[in-house]
């Protein structure tokens, strides 16, 4: 199992993008932890967060399938682009990862952002 550093990643992101950071969630096979959530987006209830984490677990579980189908090497990050946020799911292994949500404009203003996040999180 890979060593993951979600708090280190959250600290890096707060320093790098400030208020553009919306949330950081760490998950493994059995549980999850909301590492950071910006105050103005802290309106998800427990059931909604459970649903999000269930989706993250499914995404992590599909990592090996995606790697086999595409044959590009290891899948390190999945990115979802929404109107108001861009979510990045840094996949450590089959059921472990860190999900980060940023304001869309914040994400678009960064360069080589995913590579930096992978390194800071210990996933590169």
Give each language-model segment a name.
Residues 1-124:
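Non-catalytic interaction/Regulatory regions outside core domains
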